[in-house]
Amino acid sequence: MTLVKYACDYCRVRRVKCDGKKPCSRCIEHNFDCTYQQPLKKRGSKPIGTRSLKYIPKAKMFIDNKSCTAAAEILMKVPKKVIDQCLRLYHDNLYVIWPLLSYDDLHKLLDEEYNDHYVYWFLVALSAANLSDLQSELESEGGFSFTGKQLAVLCMSSRQQFDDLSGRDIFRIMTYYCLLRCFSQSSDVRNSYRLCREAIGLVIVAGLHREKAYESLSFREQQLLRKVYYLLLLTERYYSVYVHCVTSLDTTIAPPQPEFVTDPRLSLDSFFEMIRVFTVPGKCFFDALATESTSGSCTEDSLKKIWKELHTASLEIEPWSYGYVDISFSRHWIRALAWKLVFQMNGTKFFSNANNAHILVEIAKDMLDDIFLTPNNLYDVHGPGIPMKSLEVANALVDIVNKYDHNMKLEAWNILCDVSKFVFSLKHCNHKMFQRFSTKCQSALIDLPISRPLRLNDDSKDEDDIIP
């Protein structure tokens, strides 16, 4: 009986030599999710099959026209049916969180402009972001499975086709936005932020950071561009806190207009509320966090205004839906960051007012109320954002738990225990930040009531690749 030898998924091509390790250097170089379960094929050249001969003239034609670089890219095109399935999933689950185009508009693009490079790669990137957010995969009729990571890598390897320094800016911007969502879900913070900067750079080059650029556009075009602008604004402000880079987008651009819809899956209410949550603090707030310093425009009164205005969410939002979860944790996160800035400005004298000292406990209690009422499956859709935001609240609380008087300290410790249980139950991408939290608890002589070890995200990068 012949013993079957196995090889890397990437290296099973006959002419590629594999060093026998799993994954090999080529798998790592191309960020390929290797299973090492492919039958090893004989090395050496392989005669061209009859079915392959017909692709040679097509490949030459595409190369001569500079619209395609290799015949392989023709053969790797994602089937329409797979993209359409992703578009339906996006419509049903994710449009309320990051609204770009409705299913009808996306399906029309798929039918009419599938062969347009800019449109095609946007639809592939949207499919990748959708599968990444929902942590799922789809299988084509040929039995090949598509995951968000695979589609994102395919997009990045074909980047010259949709970003050739010309063409349709809006599709390039949306493509980069979708790709940054894919990389944020795989905990690749550096590349996710890099893609965010690519999209913002295109926004600025196209003049979309100036309101007058929208005046000559139709209402539909304005709506789409305003949605994209504010999606990037929210993303940039989130990353500014952890990448420590000041923001470039501000609220001089008007948000999109409300739309009358009968389908709740197309409602923009959650998106409008998220815009409110991230714009109430103002640009100076996030820049102060990025530079770890406070400016004259970021005063104690303006920070206290954040606590008050973000205390509750809009009544228009359906409680404990996909949209509500992200809004809820973002409110608690920003209020905790504002509390830390006030504490940084005033030092220990801040605790002379008992009400000030109790604000952080109230923030943590509000977060616990939402935690107890939220189904667990809703957290995963938002990827690393929920663990990071909840960990920020827990970090702030442990910093000051020993500064309370005896009665308040006991309450704060009990709340910290409940918050830490939730934090430890999530998948985390930032190991360093989590270890600092554990060290702080030990230094404060607090024993965390955790019975199981820290659960890291399976896709987490090495510590050197993670923004601390």
Swiss-Prot record:
Q: What's this protein's name?
A: Maltose fermentation regulatory protein MAL33
Annotated DNA-binding ranges? 8-34
InterPro entries reported in the protein's UniProt record: Carb_Metab_Trans_Reg, Maltose_ferment_reg_DNA-bd, Transcription_factor_dom_fun, Zn2-C6_fun-type_DNA-bd_sf, Zn2Cys6_DnaBD
The protein's job, in short, is: Regulates the coordinate transcription of structural MAL3S (maltase) and MAL3T (maltose permease) genes.
Indicate which residues form the motif Nuclear localization signal.
41-49
PROSITE patterns tied to this protein: ZN2_CY6_FUNGAL_1, ZN2_CY6_FUNGAL_2
One GO term under biological process is: regulation of DNA-templated transcription
**What coarse category fits the chief subcellular location reported for this protein?**
nucleus
> Per UniProt, which keywords does this protein have?
Activator, DNA-binding, Maltose metabolism, Metal-binding, Nucleus, Transcription, Transcription regulation, Zinc
Question: Which species expresses this protein natively?
Answer: Saccharomyces cerevisiae (strain ATCC 204508 / S288c) (Baker's yeast)
Q: Which GO terms describe its cellular component?
A: nucleus
One matching Pfam family: Zn_clus
Q: Which SMART domains match?
A: GAL4
Q: Which family does it belong to?
A: Belongs to the MAL13 family.
Which CDD domains does this entry report, sorted A to Z? Answer: fungal_TF_MHR (cd12148), GAL4 (cd00067)
Q: Localized where?
A: Nucleus
Select a single GO molecular function from the record's annotations and give it. zinc ion binding
